[in-house]
């Protein structure tokens, strides 16, 4: 692929490189504040990202693979997102309201064999044809499946992490797949690149700066 000079350098717009940068330049600054008051610095965020990435490697995930995330807005969802993108894998979040045919359609179209799922949502998977989905990391509890293999939440964050990125991740690589609402038919899978997210941010939220919390 011919590199277009209008595209920012990967270090400026690809999430994994940004986390690594801030872990050096702003190591002790707060990066994330969770519900309940727990905080992660940028250094801690990189450490946890690398641990989650290693957990996915141990499940066979590699660059370009699609992995489903069916969770509320919580720590495990952040770990799933950041860990996958650190590998260059594709984060595929699912609306927590989905069930039945809507859920089945999204799971099958996602082309994912692995999911990270909140225990409260897991029983709905027994009511659908899950396609090539075979393994589920269950967070916040346990779950039993008819045709899927359940894995404990501890598999998401092993004791040690990767020492660095395993592959080069480019601005035009797919960062995540977002499904449309499905109001005019089955939900469509929208492939969003790192560059798309980088370009959209300042346009959508021009009033946010480094001192804001979102």
Spans of features found by a protein language model:
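A short N-terminal helical cap/helix-turn-helix that marks the beginning
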Residues: 9-31, 47
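Short hydrophobic/charged patches on amphipathic alpha-helices used for structural packing
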Residues: 20, 53, 103-104, 166, ...
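Conserved AMP-binding/adenylate-forming core of the ANL superfamily
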Residues: 30-74, 78-82, 99-104
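Conserved adenylate-forming
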Residues: 56-61, 159-172, 177-214
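Short beta-strand->loop structural element characteristic of the AMP-binding/adenylate-forming
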Residues: 68-70, 77, 81, 85-116, ...
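Conserved ATP-dependent adenylate/AMP-binding module captured primarily in the ANL superfamily
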Residues: 96-127, 198-214
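ANL superfamily adenylate-forming
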Residues: 122-171
């Amino acid at each position: 692929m011919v590199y277009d000079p209008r595209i920012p350098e990967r270090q400026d717009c690809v999430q994994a490189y940004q986390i690594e940068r801030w872990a050096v330049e702003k190591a002790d600054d707060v990066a994330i504040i969770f519900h309940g008051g727990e905080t992660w610095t940028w250094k801690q965020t990189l450490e946890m990202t690398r641990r989650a990435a290693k957990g996915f490697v141990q499940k066979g995930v590699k660059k370009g693979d699609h992995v489903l995330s069916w969770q509320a807005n919580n720590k495990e969802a952040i770990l799933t997102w950041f860990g996958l993108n650190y590998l260059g894998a594709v984060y595929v979040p699912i609306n927590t309201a989905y069930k039945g045919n809507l859920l089945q359609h999204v799971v099958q179209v996602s082309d994912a064999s692995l999911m990270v799922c909140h225990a409260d949502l897991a029983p709905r998977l027994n009511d659908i044809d899950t396609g090539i989905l075979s393994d589920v990391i269950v967070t916040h509890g346990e779950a039993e499946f008819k045709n899927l293999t359940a894995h404990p939440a501890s598999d998401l964050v092993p004791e040690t992490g990767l020492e660095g990125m395993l592959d080069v991740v480019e601005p035009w690589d797919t960062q995540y797949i977002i499904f449309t609402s499905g109001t005019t038919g089955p939900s469509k899978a929208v492939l969003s690149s790192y560059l798309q997210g980088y370009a959209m941010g300042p346009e959508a939220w021009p009033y946010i700066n480094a001192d804001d919390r979102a």
